[in-house]
Every structure is written in C-alpha cells, then in structure tokens.
A protein has these predicted regions:
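Sec-dependent signal peptide recognition
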Residues: 1-8
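Hydrophobic h-region of N-terminal signal peptides that target proteins for export
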Residues: 9-16
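Catalytic glycan-binding domains that act on GlcNAc-containing polysaccharides
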Residues: 16-162
Length: 162
C-alpha cells in the first residue's frame, strides 16, 4: 500500500509545471527557458510579429501554463460542468481555429502545449488579422481584441458590448 501511495505521489509531482520565473520579466522568461527566445524570434522572422506581442498574448491567455484551459462552469454550484470554450494551451487557441492553422500551414504535428507551435500560431493569426483587418503588426491592443473576439467579432466590434 505504501508503494502504491509513493508511486501516486511521484506521478503527481511529475505532472507539476515549473513556472519558477517572473512572467512579467522577459529577461527572466528567456533565462529560464532559453529555447523560447529562438522560437519567438523564428516567429518574428516568419510572420513579422514582434516578440513582445507574442509574449503578451501568451501571458494574458495562459500565464505561460502549457495545459491552461478555461474553468469549468458549476452545475448546482458544486458539480464541475462543461468548459466555456475549447481554448487550450499556451495560446488558448480554440479547436476550430487550431485546425485552420494546421490546414493553412501544413504543420500537422502542431501541439497547443508546445511553446514553439503556440508562438507560430500567434504569428499566423496576427499576420492574418494584419492582412484582413489592416492592423499594424505593432498594434498590440487591437490585435488582441481581434485575437480574443475573433476577426468577425472584431469587425462587428463585439468587444464594445462587454
């Protein structure tokens, strides 16, 4: 019985995410996760999307938690129900939008829990918004509204109703 409990404890410890960095400090983020710098630079070079925009989206959407999901709604105040959306991972990409990304880029192995893929997804999405909505790639505020509301929601200015 003790071995069983020990195995369960070790398993749970292995599932913990190490976020021992200050999410408000880009230098600390890259010092703790050096590959992330090259991933965000790759996205910048590929899509023309600033590193600061990528990181601000990821911080706001998932707080750098790779398995982030929206909270579950409560049924009768205590029973976990459905989630508000299918958002998942660093970028909090919805299932349908993630599938669009995979189709458009041919990146069939993309994973929303993978930082490189999440960064590339944000670059792809912002580039699409730049083309469709004519937003400057440095306009973080309006790009975030388009990202959060969807491009159609942005065009309808659905954010004004919130």
């Amino acid at each position: 019985m003790i071995k069983f409990i020990l195995v369960i404890c070790l398993f749970l410890i292995g599932c913990l995410t190490d976020r021992s960095f200050n999410t408000a400090n880009i230098c600390d983020i890259f010092k703790t996760n050096p590959k992330w710098k090259s991933y965000t630079e790759d996205t910048k070079n590929k899509w023309g999307v600033p590193v600061s925009l990528q990181l601000s989206f990821i911080k706001h959407e998932s707080s750098f938690k790779r398995t982030a999901r929206p909270p579950r709604k409560k049924v009768l105040g205590i029973i976990p129900g459905l989630r508000a959306s299918s958002a998942y991972g660093y970028s909090q990409a919805l299932d349908g939008t993630w599938e669009e990304y995979i189709q458009a880029t041919g990146n069939s192995n993309a994973d929303r829990k993978n930082f490189r893929d999440a960064s590339d997804f944000i670059g792809w999405y912002v580039d699409g918004s730049y083309r469709l909505l004519k937003l400057s790639k440095n306009d973080v505020y309006n790009h975030y509204l388009a990202y959060h509301e969807g491009r159609g929601g942005y065009q309808k200015k659905s954010f004004n109703k919130k």
